[in-house]
């Protein structure tokens, strides 16, 4: 079994970061090979949400460099934390992850992420589990940090008051 822990500080309040993780509108296309499709939205706070994710995996797994996971979310505490359980492929694996948002004040949040990963097949577990999980985790860390910081910038820009351009004609 592999364990991955990651923490990153981002420019955004826990509420802003939460709104990005739990966004339920149309998804923006990505060039990173990552997509998240909501299969079931869960209750009003997201408890029971089910999602299908695609992500990059090493090409030597002969899947065209694409992995899949089916994830369900539980233990949801709005603007604070959630847990997910997942089944994924290739390597047919089980994962469990937890995300916690720590308010640092001054509009900043530290995101704590922990995941355990276990390939079902004992031969593939011995040969590939560590390398594959390291590849996926490294990619996720970079993508999450970039996406959250970019998303918070877009949220704040959308909320910023619009200023009217000054008239080119002077009033008498």
Question: What residues fall within each predicted segment?
Answer:
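Hydrophobic ligand-binding cavity/cleft-lining segments
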Residues: 1-46, 170-172
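Short beta-strand micro-motifs in enzyme catalytic cores
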Residues: 2, 49-51, 109
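Generic structural detector for well-ordered beta-strands
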Residues: 7-11, 54, 72, 100
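Conserved short hydrophobic interaction patches
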Residues: 23-25, 76, 146, 150
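Hydrophobic-ligand binding "helix-grip"
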Residues: 29-33, 58-112, 116-118
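Short acidic/glycine-enriched loop/turn segments that link adjacent beta-strands
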Residues: 45-47, 92-93
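Short coil-to-beta transition motif at edge beta-strands of beta-rich domains
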Residues: 46-56
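A conserved amphipathic terminal alpha-helix motif
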Residues: 116-172
């Amino acid at each position: 079994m592999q364990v991955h822990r990651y923490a990153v500080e981002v420019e955004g309040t826990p509420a802003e970061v939460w709104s990005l993780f739990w966004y339920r509108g149309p998804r923006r296309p990505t060039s990173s090979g990552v997509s998240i499709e909501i299969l079931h939205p869960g209750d009003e706070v997201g408890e029971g949400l089910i999602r299908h994710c695609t992500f990059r995996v090493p090409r030597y797994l002969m899947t065209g460099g694409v992995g899949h996971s089916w994830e369900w979310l539980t233990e949801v505490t709005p603007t604070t934390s959630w847990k997910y359980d997942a089944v994924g492929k290739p390597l047919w694996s089980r994962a469990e992850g937890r995300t916690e948002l720590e308010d640092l004040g001054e509009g900043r949040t530290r995101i704590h992420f922990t995941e355990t990963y276990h390939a079902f097949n004992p031969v593939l577990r011995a040969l590939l589990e560590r390398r594959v999980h390291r590849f996926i985790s490294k990619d996720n860390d970079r993508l999450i940090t970039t996406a959250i910081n970019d998303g918070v910038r877009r949220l704040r820009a959308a909320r910023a008051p619009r200023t009217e351009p000054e008239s080119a004609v002077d009033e008498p």
